[in-house]
Amino acid sequence: MVKKNLSTSAILFKDLLRTLKKDWKQFISIILISLLSTCLFAGLISNANKLEKRANNLYSSCNYADIYVTTNSYDKKDIINLPSQIEEIETIEKRTYMPVDFKKNGINIIVSDSENTLSHPILISGEYGYLAMGKFLQSENLKIGDSFSITCNNFLKNSLLEYSRILDNLKTNDTNILLESKINFSIKITGEMYHPEGVQNSSFSSSLGYMSPEYLKELILNLIKNNYNYDSLDGLISLFMGSSLEDLISSKLDSFSNQYLIKAKNSLSNDNTLEQIRQYYESKKENNLMLATEKEYLESYQMLNQDVTQAGKLPYVFPIIFFLVSALIILTTITQIIIKQRSQIGCLKAIGVPRKNIYIHYMGIGTFLTLFGSLLGMILGPIIIPPVLEVKYNLLWDLPKTTTPFFSWQALLMLISMLLITIICGFFVSRNVIKEKPVKTLRPKISVAQKHVPNPNSFYYKHTSLSLKMALRNISKSKAKTIMVILGTLGCSSLAVCGFGIMDTLNYGIFYDYNANINMKISAEGLENNKNIKEDIYTIEGVEKVEIVSSYSATLISETSYIISPVYLLENNSSYFPAINEHPGLNIDKTTADKLNLKVGDEIDISINSNSYTKKINRIFESSILHGIYDLSVNYSENISSVSVYYIYGKKDISNDNLKENLLQSNLFSSINTYDDMMTRAHEIMSSIELMTDVIKIFAILLCIVVIYNLSSLNISERTRDIATMKVLGFKFKSIASTLTIELMVDAVIGGLLGLLFGFPMTYMVLSVNITSLLTFMYHIYWYSYMYGFLVTGGTALVVSLFLNKKIKKVKMVESLKSIE
């Protein structure tokens, strides 16, 4: 009997060293599969926590307002009456929200006092004056100190026209800006900022600008100085008003305020506060309320919060597959190791080692390996995964940087789950052996006789090779291992199809929009000094038709919410958007309609600059990247400014590239793009998402390699006596290897084919938690992607199997055929 614990520990430690030396490859497979599953899960959790941290840091640093109240006219009593009548209002501040025209998407400029504390900007560099978002500077290739031009409604027109003698002070040959419907400002960028309302990338939506009233006043004064005799005009204003022109403009700017920001004492009671605000405005003689909403209904907040939520869901999609496969691999590996050590367990029991120590020993082997692999995965995951996905987030969002959080309770829970599975597997597998008597475990386990003996005269028996017969026999004999291989390759195949399917879905959406929804050959934007060049375009060689499509950044308002979205106005008999000819009236994409909770027949309010329209929805269409409203231009006012794009269609005998060359030589355009150019640009935007799909494919291949390597190694170890027998009987290496390869490939083919069935559901799950405001997913997987997914799985399995078949040469015939009896 072993009396001292030290002696028992020494025996078990030596046994552990022997086991490590003999089965080190199986142990590495446990470490790798634990590492892969934990690495992917911990990395995605870290990515989700990092994105949420970036958003929350921005919100707290900017002191994000709880409620936004937008009015159509300024009433100075509101800012006094609202907090006095509504107890829940802690802080209220006023500002001016001013959409302006700039290129295609426009800019939403906030004019706010520097003393305001709600939803204020974070200054990155430069100084206060006009602050721009970093993504805007990057996309427009601008820097601090540069200037750019904007166009906006002439808010001075109605406020200063009462001073008719101003016209007498107009400079010779200059423009009387007070009579113009639009005015232009040249804005100098003084600083770069972060702001919670401007987090969306300006390449895909309106950017945000932030300026002080003093800066806007300076812009107006410069505009007046450029067009009027300033000194005489200032004297005239002083004579009639008793104040300087500068003071007059300051008072006028104050009356332009159209928005109140509110911080509630208790954000949980925002619904009640909103109701009281609406009741206050309804009780007024002149109700000037346009919209009162919580910050949660702002488009910028909704879109970012959607991405944060989706990032939090992503770790629970395909990493679960790795977790389940990991559990199966660990179970199989530990089972095989313990079964191979039946005789050693019998010896340990025979010399008096307590059962408790044997349990701890075999449970501890798997636990230690799983713990090591999982800890390594918890470290590597946050290092590898977040930087890859950050490429996507930086494309979409303008957020402050932050450090990557490493350890999280979710990853720790994953680690504990892995350890529990390993401990439970080790206990129950070792229990089946430990409960046997020592004398029984010292003998080889008796194989169960084959119940069904094939008929040697049957067609199957005569026309089937020996390798295939043995492979099929081994498959039916080792059902547990067969299930492991099938499940492992099923996971690999479904992940591979998912990786290809994501890109198929994106490409299909783009192809659908540019071929089914719109008809585009060449698009061109005219130079700023060439507003009406349609007739000139017709004189260019090869041009058959020219269509002008005007785009606007508009506010779309339904009964429940509002968003900023583009509006595209088309000519009659449109070639660019052919559906408008069959469905004349307002056409809106499904994503925009869903945001506003609208259906066909509902009415929508459209605010473009200072013009308001109420339209009935005639058609809702499926789209991927086309978002907004499409309508005929004849249904709208002619005096609203727009950004116009010329869609040019060539004659049949000229290619798009040749027509583009002719258009470039005309010097009428600032930019020209063909259909191929747009496709190239779209794929460049998708490159960040393609990087994510490559990660999925790589993990799928790694999963397949680990599973096949582990189970193939176990298979060869189990078949040692069979391999030695075949060698004795004179079978060559090729014949023996083909038996093992066929056995593995039959399982891999079954698993690969089953995995194809799960490819589409997995693609749907992954993309459903990655919805963005840029595009709507039109789920689609091409047939050849299924083929590629199957080939990736089958090819990986075949390569690993052929590599491991070299072990057959190391099997020694005499030693392998020895029996303990």
List the model feature ranges, each with a label.
Residues V645-Y647, N662-S768, T772, T776-I781, ...:
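C-terminal transmembrane helical bundles of large multi-pass transporters
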Residues M1-C39, M363, T367, K451-G491, ...:
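N-terminal Sec/SRP start-transfer signal
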Residues D23, L328-F368, C704-D747:
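Interfacial "coupling" helices/loops that link adjacent transmembrane helices in transporter permeases
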Residues A327, L331-Q336, Q341-S343, T367-L399, ...:
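Small-residue-rich transmembrane alpha-helices
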Residues P354-R355, K437, K599, K732, ...:
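Short coil/turn motifs that cap or connect alpha-helices
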Residues V69, L466-D594, K599-D602, I606-S612, ...:
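Juxtamembrane segments of multi-pass membrane proteins
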Residues V2, K435-H452, K806-E821:
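Short cytosolic juxtamembrane segments of multi-pass membrane proteins
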Residues V2-A327, Q336, L395, G509-I522, ...:
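Membrane transport/envelope proteins' first extracytoplasmic loop
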